[in-house]
Design a protein with these regions (language model features):
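Transmembrane alpha-helical core positions of polytopic small-molecule transporters
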Residues: 20, 88-89, 144
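Helical cap/lid subdomains and adjacent loops of hydrolase enzymes that gate the active-site channel
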Residues: 30-33, 39-54, 81-93
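A metal-dependent, Asp-based hydrolase signature
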Residues: 49-82
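An amphipathic alpha-helix signature
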Residues: 27-31, 60-68, 116
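Active-site neighborhood of HAD-like aspartate-dependent phosphohydrolases
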Residues: 2-47, 70
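Asp-based, Mg2+/Mn2+-dependent phosphohydrolase catalytic module
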Residues: 1-15, 109-111, 115-116, 120-220
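Short, acidic loop-to-helix structural element flanking the phosphoryl-transfer center
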Residues: 9, 80-108, 148
Length: 220
């Protein structure tokens, strides 16, 4: 049934991190910090990130050690690389305001393939860490999205309506629909959805209006 502003009850909102709450650039833009060619295939930053994402390394220190081994860069350069790539995303103030507004009415869960310490550092810097009731991250689970384990971790104990928001329909939201979540896709020019999501938004800032508008989101 549609969610109407007049009868809207608290929901369980599962939010992706990159592409929804924050925007990361292409990490290859900072290849010079490591002294590597950004055109290298595979780019050496990727296996280091994937190792963290998949739980093979468990801390920033271990990531830095691996990145240094892969690139030959100093630990100092690798720490600078982390600062520039993962700890300094674009985080519009409007997004922080949206998070605070949503958290005042709904339960918020952040669900990401990003490393927990990096997410927590950024959320704390912008004063929104307390907006989230839980962080579900693939390094802790050792299973990146779209493995179903993380989706089940995000589900509430009760029967609240569950909505997932992501800019990646094919990788994230199809599995969300499979486990009964309503999908809200942040439109992404780099992706063509396999099928129509339950709702579309242009930016994260549009989410409150969609949740509160008759017919905006047909909850599963």
């Amino acid at each position: 049934m549609p969610v109407s502003k007049a009868h809207q009850s608290p929901m369980h909102l599962v939010l992706d991190y990159g592409g929804v709450v924050v925007e990361h650039g292409d990490e290859r833009e900072h290849a010079h910090v490591l002294g590597v060619d950004p055109g290298t295939d595979p780019y050496p930053g990727w296996p280091a990130y994937f190792a963290f994402r998949d739980g093979f390394v468990q801390s920033t220190a271990e990531y830095v050690d691996l990145l240094s081994t892969l690139t030959g860069a100093s630990r100092e350069a690798c720490h600078e690389y982390v600062e520039r790539t993962w700890l300094d995303p674009e985080f519009p103030e409007a997004h922080a305001d949206v998070l605070r507004d949503l958290a005042s009415e709904h339960t918020l869960v952040l669900f990401s393939n990003m490393a927990r310490p990096w997410i927590e550092a950024v959320l704390s810097e912008y004063g929104v860490r307390e907006c989230f009731d839980d962080l579900v991250v693939s390094p802790d689970l050792r299973r990146p999205k779209p493995h179903p384990r993380g989706y089940f971790e995000c589900l509430p104990d009760g029967d609240e309506r569950v909505v997932m928001v992501s800019d990646e329909y094919n990788e994230d939201l199809m599995m969300a629909e499979t486990v009964g979540m309503t999908s809200v896709w942040v439109e992404n020019d780099d992706e063509t959805p396999y099928r129509e999501p339950d709702a579309r938004i242009s930016t994260f800032a549009d989410l409150p209006d969609v949740l509160a508008t008759d017919g905006g989101v047909s909850v599963r």
